[in-house]
Amino acid sequence: MSMTVTTSSNVSDAAMLSRLALQIKSWGKALGFAQIGICDTDLTAEEAKLQTWLDKGFHGEMAYMETHGMMRARPHELHSGTVRVISARMDYLPPEAGFATNLASPNMGYISRYAGGRDYHKLIRARLKKLGDQINSELVALGFDAADFRPFVDSAPVLERPLAEKAGIGWTGKHSLILNHDAGSWFFLGELLINLPLPVDIPVQEGCHSCVACITSCPTGAIVEPYTVDARRCISYLTIELQGAIPEEFRPLMGNRIYGCDDCQLVCPVNRAAPLTQESDFHIRPKLKQPELLTLFTWSETEFLKQTEGSAIRRIGHQRWLRNIAVALGNAPSSADIISALEQRKAQADVDEMVKEHIDWALAQQRAGDLQTNNRKTERLVRVIQKGLPRDA
């Protein structure tokens, strides 16, 4: 339902909307969002970029990126009547992140820090719903009809990063993530699509300048040019989105990263002063904090489902979990214990052929016995973290 004015003139309506926009930002912070921004729905400039990216096949097996076509760049088609997008930022950097400790320990599994706690999708969507309800309560109290709104997170076909940039949340870094001068890139985004003509915010100035740290540090060279990521090369894609076999050329480069990758964020100088999350739900679960690869590899499917309940990790399923860990074990220092664990897991009936192929690769790597426990990029990354992010090292 569109907003219907019952008492105010257009001038007073504009003033009311300005006041409401300020209230929305205040309500958002009370709900746990670190920042709220507002923008219009025009993403025309992004359509050509999206189509080029898709045409080059950079989305890999993420067919859903292509299925929804340009709807991603047209919020008003995603939710009819939408004239504004309220973009919300929620910080997730956990305390005692232990980045360097984890990456420097090849017998431990590295899990991207966004996934160490509770799955953010339901949490953020619920908070956005509360924000929409507060907006409508205020509108009704002022004598207006309730607005029509719909909350989204990144599981929906919406270009959240360009919207966040338009809404003044930050600028697009060369790694394609949104960067904020105060918060770096350690945050989730959510959107509230609404048919309320609120005043929009001003985008911030780009701040990367000549820095290319993210590009040069990517383990697999996935940032093929500034602002462009070939997902097919990205460790996050390979360990989370890819359903089949991980190409052999990338396996040695993955190191101990078993779910996602944070390297491009860890070297970014904008992240040096990033705040810790205020959400305890995003703190790393004890059994996912500096976890031993051999321990994780013994988890049955039942144990996997139990330990990942309410976590984003659960979506990859037990077989891909084993696939990723097998690769990490193949990259670990040669060990009789690892070889034994790989052989035992391969012999189990619940292991599919895809996982067995990765186990065979890992066994060959282990038996070669001349592995480098850390490649040069990882060693350099650890030094960068220790120097630039001492609190989180």
Curated annotation (Swiss-Prot):
Task: Name the cofactor(s) required for activity, per the record.
Answer: cob(II)alamin; [4Fe-4S] cluster
One cellular component term (GO) for this entry is: cytoplasm
Which reaction is catalysed here? epoxyqueuosine(34) in tRNA + AH2 = queuosine(34) in tRNA + A + H2O
Q: Where is it chiefly localized? A: cytoplasm
Enzyme category, top tier:
oxidoreductase
Q: In which pathway does it act?
A: tRNA modification; tRNA-queuosine biosynthesis
Coiled coil start-end? none
Q: Localized where?
A: Cytoplasm
Binding note for cofactor? Binds 2 [4Fe-4S] clusters per monomer.
- Highest rank taxon of the organism: Bacteria
Q: Which residues are [4Fe-4S] cluster 1-binding? A: C208, C211, C214, C268
Q: Please identify the protein, giving its name as recorded.
A: Epoxyqueuosine reductase
